[in-house]
UniProtKB/Swiss-Prot annotation:
Chief place where the protein resides: host cell
Keyword Transmembrane helix appears in the UniProt entry: yes
Subcellular location, record wording: Host membrane
Name used for this protein in its record: Uncharacterized protein US34A
Gene that encodes it: US34A
Transmembrane segments: 15-37
GO cellular component: host cell membrane; membrane
Family: Belongs to the HHV-5 US34A protein family.
Pfam family, one: HHV-5_US34A
Membrane topology of the entry: Single-pass membrane protein
Keyword field: Host membrane, Membrane, Transmembrane, Transmembrane helix
InterPro entries to which the protein is assigned, alphabetical: HHV-5_US34A
Lineage: superkingdom: Viruses
């Protein structure tokens, strides 16, 4: 078994990935990145709106 693995390591040919497979991988990675950016932006907006709401409530209490 070990001999087989060593023999396999010696025959190190560059791995050829078909172009369309590479394209699909890039599309998936790009989609994941876009989704992550959207989530971060939504979370930031949510925090910002929450802060605004709290500030408005505080202002109303201090000026009756």
């Amino acid at each position: 078994m070990l001999k087989f693995l060593l023999k396999f390591r010696k025959r190190r040919r560059p791995v050829v990935v078909p172009r369309f497979v590479r394209f699909i991988v890039y599309v998936v990675l790009f989609t994941v990145a876009v989704q992550r950016v959207k989530q971060e932006r939504d979370a930031h907006l949510r925090r910002y709106e929450e802060r605004l709401r709290k500030n408005r409530a505080r202002r109303r209490q201090s000026f009756p």
